[in-house]
Design a protein with these regions (language model features):
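Core catalytic region of metal-dependent phosphoesterases/phosphodiesterases
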Residues: 9-140
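Active-site-proximal beta-strand elements of phosphoester/diester hydrolases
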Residues: 1-8, 141
């Protein structure tokens, strides 16, 4: 059994998974909202690197009220378009992740940035949402 925590849309890592006849257990966050090391992720795609860098710096400096206000401002300019762009970026990342994962027996538990509804649209006989379930594992044949 292979355990992965926080995929964060790291496709190059997922492509290195060994093909074994046992489950891959993923503990949350299949998508990358913001990578606090370099600013990559959905927020950068939608709001631009400059805004994401500001958000990262405000977080590092514990200036949470200013950070909250910046988020509000970013969402206030054309909210319908922003929400559509966010949704499209989220769906794109899940599509890329699950394109790789469908080759494996996967048990996933959604993380705090994950969209359970979208994730569940990718479930199949080999890809399962096991959040809140008790799983007893025996070798797959």
């Amino acid at each position: 059994m292979i355990f992965i925590s926080y995929v964060h849309h790291q496709l190059e890592f997922l492509k290195l998974l060994p093909k074994k006849n046992e489950p891959v257990v993923i503990l949350g966050d299949l998508i990358n909202w913001i990578d606090y090391r370099n600013g990559d992720g959905i927020a950068k795609e939608v709001f631009g690197l400059e805004n994401v860098q500001k958000l990262i710096n405000l977080r590092k400096e514990h200036r949470f009220e200013e950070r909250k206000n910046l988020w509000k401002n970013l969402y206030s300019n054309n909210p319908e378009v922003i929400m559509k762009n966010i949704r499209d970026a989220i769906e794109n990342q899940y599509e890329e992740v699950f394109r790789i994962l469908k080759k494996y027996h996967v048990w996933f538990i959604p993380g705090n940035v994950d969209d359970v509804e979208i994730m569940n649209s990718y479930t199949s006989s080999t890809v399962k949402n096991v959040d809140g379930l008790l799983i007893e594992h025996q070798a797959l044949s």
